[in-house]
Amino acid sequence: MLCAISGKVPRRPVLSPKSRTIFEKSLLEQYVKDTGNDPITNEPLSIEEIVEIVPSAQQASLTESTNSATLKANYSIPNLLTSLQNEWDAIMLENFKLRSTLDSLTKKLSTVMYERDAAKLVAAQLLMEKNEDSKDLPKSSQQAVAITREEFLQGLLQSSRDFVARGKLKAPKWPILKNLELLQAQNYSRNIKTFPYKELNKSMYYDKWVCMCRCEDGALHFTQLKDSKTITTITTPNPRTGGEHPAIISRGPCNRLLLLYPGNQITILDSKTNKVLREIEVDSANEIIYMYGHNEVNTEYFIWADNRGTIGFQSYEDDSQYIVHSAKSDVEYSSGVLHKDSLLLALYSPDGILDVYNLSSPDQASSRFPVDEEAKIKEVKFADNGYWMVVECDQTVVCFDLRKDVGTLAYPTYTIPEFKTGTVTYDIDDSGKNMIAYSNESNSLTIYKFDKKTKNWTKDEESALCLQSDTADFTDMDVVCGDGGIAAILKTNDSFNIVALTP
């Protein structure tokens, strides 16, 4: 038998009834006096409960011989040895207490660590649930706290002012163009309308991205460029697997792609991941003919307009929608264009109807700008200077000065001489001061520049460029101008060629 405290054979063995363990009597009694508990189970224990064990004569002799042999083997003076033995027993008792305390603290620490880990798991689970719930939070909060149309328009106005305050936009200068490279023809779907996307670069100049799309084999194939050197081709699966083709495709900020399908159903697609972000059905009885997402002003919403003049802003993230102008019964628009400050929207049709809407004043009637019914409007542009509205017609160029009374021209209506043959297509850059015209008769590109002094267009005789004689007859053109140079996109009914122009 060994003492549970000292680890030695007890000279006077006793038994604790609580733990049923053997101890040295003096050590156990001292422990009970100090703590009042059993050393092993830590249950309450009194000295009276301690059971003394009376060893047999053989056991007593063995114990005495063991202790005596130990003492005599190490010490020579019996009294000193007895004192040392008592000190040793006291040390062992203290050591046992410390071990017990250490074991208790270790168990408590283990419990605390376990509870801490459990708390972390619970917190992580709650955080995951919070993140899941937060996805629906904007929608529910938007419904709970209704934002009025007036408050929305105030936000639109302030966002526009902040953008304008950043400074005046710069436009790259056109060099004298003497060389060209005609790139290989590509097919596109003419019935899919695309709108140029403007992106502000570090030089405070708007890069205009022109996009052509071909819908084929369940995929949308995009070719887009902002100058003669930056040409990209992207293919993304058509979100509509039933064979439906989009009627309008327009880019928005943060890699968003807006796809309008029949029935005024809009799909918002992430152009990087090809993931469908949202499906929206616009509640309008009329056909949507324009949609666009400004990348600097009011970037949480995109604008749409239908052929009767209903104009609305739709949130990318939820069902929030604000109608800023209601439909008319006496017009039928075919397209539109948004001013750079996002406060003016021009809606027009080929038969000479051109109305400009002030988006910050929904109660204000639109302004009708006079265009000859026979002019056949092809495209309307707001120039980068902010106050010119350029109207490209079949045979004439009309430019209005928005700073003056409605209908005031910035310069006299201009007709290019070659237009008399009816075989020329042209486009004007976003500055409103550079024009490229292509003649199907001579297969040549001609540059025209606006002269401030004479307020007229002049032909740049040094920039006449000829294409090969077997080039197709082109019916439409887009011009882009960026840091990488100037390019013209010449289009037929089903194909296009990119012409890179260099000094």
From Swiss-Prot:
U-box domain sequence ranges: 1-71
Reactions catalysed, as given in the entry: S-ubiquitinyl-[E2 ubiquitin-conjugating enzyme]-L-cysteine + [acceptor protein]-L-lysine = [E2 ubiquitin-conjugating enzyme]-L-cysteine + N(6)-ubiquitinyl-[acceptor protein]-L-lysine
EC number: 2.3.2.27
Localisation per UniProt entry: Nucleus
Keyword set includes Nucleus: yes
Transmembrane parts of this sequence: none
PROSITE patterns per the UniProt record, alphabetical: U_BOX (PS51698)
Matching Gene3D superfamilies: YVTN repeat-like/Quinoprotein amine dehydrogenase, Zinc/RING finger domain, C3HC4 (zinc finger)
First and last residues of every WD repeat: 328-367, 372-410, 418-458
Biological pathway: Protein modification; protein ubiquitination
Region ranges (Interaction with CEF1): 76-134
InterPro entries: Pre-mRNA_splic_Prp19_cc, Prp19, Quinoprotein_ADH-like_sf, RING-Ubox_PRP19, Ubox_domain, WD40/YVTN_repeat-like_dom_sf, Znf_RING/FYVE/PHD
Additional free-text comment from the UniProt record: Present with 11700 molecules/cell in log phase SD medium.
Family: Belongs to the WD repeat PRP19 family.
Entry-linked PANTHER family: PRE-MRNA-PROCESSING FACTOR 19
Name of the molecule in the record: Pre-mRNA-processing factor 19
Organism per entry: Saccharomyces cerevisiae (strain ATCC 204508 / S288c) (Baker's yeast)
Name of the encoding gene: PRP19
